A protein has these predicted regions:
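Conserved catalytic-core segment of NTP-binding enzymes
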Residues: 66-69, 73-76, 80-160, 164, ...
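Acidic-aromatic/histidine active-site loop/patch
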Residues: 27, 123-127, 131-132, 136, ...
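A structural preference for long, well-packed, hydrophobic secondary-structure segments
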Residues: 41, 49-57, 64
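Phosphate-binding loop that captures ATP/GTP phosphates
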Residues: 1-47
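Flexible beta-alpha connector loops of hexameric P-loop NTPases
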Residues: 20-27, 54-61, 110-112
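C-terminal boundary of histidine-terminating zinc-finger modules
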Residues: 19, 172-192
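Active-site/binding-pocket entry motifs
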Residues: 44, 53-54, 167-168
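Short, hinge-like loop/turn segments at secondary-structure boundaries
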Residues: 12-17, 123-125, 150-153, 176-180
């Protein structure tokens, strides 16, 4: 998490230490150094955040050299490293995306203002020769602007779609209980798992659960 730890809030957790607190004098960043900064979730996911909540540690400039060193170390210890970046339209800030293997724009296809913001972001990425994947969130079947229309306007392809279910997701966020755990059979959870499997290079169709028969 390169911002203020929103990803931790989604799982009702807080960080004791943040990556921004690594002393500047430290030149060699390895996994052993980073382990104390991890917040371990019961799902097995490890969270690292660059800053605390705003009242404790306001976000500042992220040194790309330090970020690259951190990512290099994390790649050595984890099969997948997912980086959540703050929303920004400043082209210089987008340079950090050049450090990523893949980039995903999460867009909400609701109105023309959202389309304008997404287009500006995609254009900014193109300055750094970054071609993002387009993931649509909170998609409504009866929306005026379809994901296909927006993708066409952006010159990108629809990578995946997550349906709109405000009640389920808002409750999940407020409780800090991930929807894929609390409501695994919901359409939102299924879509999130599908996107995760696609990102991991796995078949998007989930393996069928084995049925066990008991005879008494």
């Amino acid at each position: 998490d390169l911002f203020i730890g929103d990803t931790l809030a989604l799982v009702n957790a807080t960080a004791r230490m943040t990556l921004s607190e690594i002393p500047e004098a430290v030149r060699e960043v390895d996994l052993e150094l980073l382990r104390p900064y991890a917040v371990r979730h019961e799902s097995g996911v490890h969270f690292y955040t660059w800053f605390f909540a705003p009242e404790r540690n306001l976000p500042e400039y992220i040194d790309l050299g330090r970020l690259e060193a951190v990512l290099r170390a994390l790649r050595e210890g984890y099969r997948f490293v997912l980086v959540d970046t703050p929303l920004t339209l400043y082209v210089p800030d987008l340079e950090l995306l050049t450090l990523m293997d893949e980039v995903i724009i999460v867009a909400v296809p609701w109105d023309l203002l959202s389309l304008r913001a997404t287009k500006a972001l995609a254009l900014g990425m193109s300055r750094w020769k970054v071609t993002p994947k387009l993931l649509f969130n909170r998609v409504q079947a009866d929306a005026d602007l379809t994901p296909e229309f927006i993708a066409n306007q952006l010159g990108l392809e629809v990578w995946d779609i997550i349906p709109n279910d405000g009640r389920t997701v808002v409750q999940s966020v407020n409780l800090g209980d991930p929807v894929v755990i609390s409501r695994p059979e919901s359409e939102v959870a299924k879509a999130i798992r599908r996107a995760a499997r696609r990102l991991a290079g796995l078949p998007t169709e989930e393996p069928k659960r084995r049925k066990f028969l008991f005879f008494g």
